[in-house]
Amino acid sequence: MSIKSDKWIRRMAEQHGMIEPFEPGQVREADGRRIVSYGTSSYGYDIRCADEFKIFTNINSTIVDPKNFDEKSFVDFKGDVCIIPPNSFALARTMEYFRIPRTVLTVCLGKSTYARCGIIVNVTPFEPEWEGYVTLEFSNTTPLPAKIYAGEGCAQVLFFESDEPCETSYRDRGGKYQGQHGVTLPKT
């Protein structure tokens, strides 16, 4: 398995619709102001956070159970900036829709701009032939409220291509998050 370059990422996005919308360069400024960068980098793609959020709350004082998750544990929010309460988290989604080729697996890492502020971005790998908007998890590890900016970079996707196609892809096995739109809660 080898990591793929900016040239490969551009070709796959432009000719095969792997990333939509796609930014072929690196954007660091918008409307004359500095932003958290997004777009194609040397060996990855910096994804953006959309303006849809689900902010975790303990209003219902329930037990967090990934097999039986209570939707009422979240407050829906739409806006350019999301404030995550101290020691809490929020879910969001990418602005980009992904179509992962059968021979490719991705790994996604949070951007250091957020990590250096105690905000951790977690995303699981995008498996071969998975497609959809990516659900993002932002953890505020600090004792203070934390800001997340919609429309700006939040994590980097690295693309790895195998020497041979997998026997069974995510699509083949009917993965539960295939084709997801919006912020998707846990499913079992």
Curated annotation (Swiss-Prot):
Transmembrane segments: none
Listed pathway(s): Pyrimidine metabolism; dUMP biosynthesis; dUMP from dCTP (dUTP route): step 1/2
Enzyme Commission number: 3.5.4.13
SUPFAM superfamilies: dUTPase-like (SSF51283)
Classification via CDD domains: trimeric_dUTPase
Residue numbers binding dCTP: 111-116, 135-137, 156, 170, 180
InterPro entries, per the entry: dCTP_deaminase (IPR011962), dUTPase-like_sf (IPR036157), dUTPase_trimeric (IPR033704)
Any GO BP: dUTP biosynthetic process
Disulfide bonds: none
Catalysis performed (reactions): dCTP + H2O + H(+) = dUTP + NH4(+)
Listed Gene3D superfamilies: 2.70.40.10
Active-site residues, record numbering mapped to chain: 137
Pfam families: DCD
GO molecular function annotations of the record: dCTP deaminase activity; nucleotide binding
UniProt keyword annotations, A-Z: Hydrolase, Nucleotide metabolism, Nucleotide-binding
Similarity comment: family membership: Belongs to the dCTP deaminase family.
Biological role: Catalyzes the deamination of dCTP to dUTP.
Self-association and partners: Homotrimer.
Name of this chain's protein: dCTP deaminase
Gene from which this protein is expressed: dcd
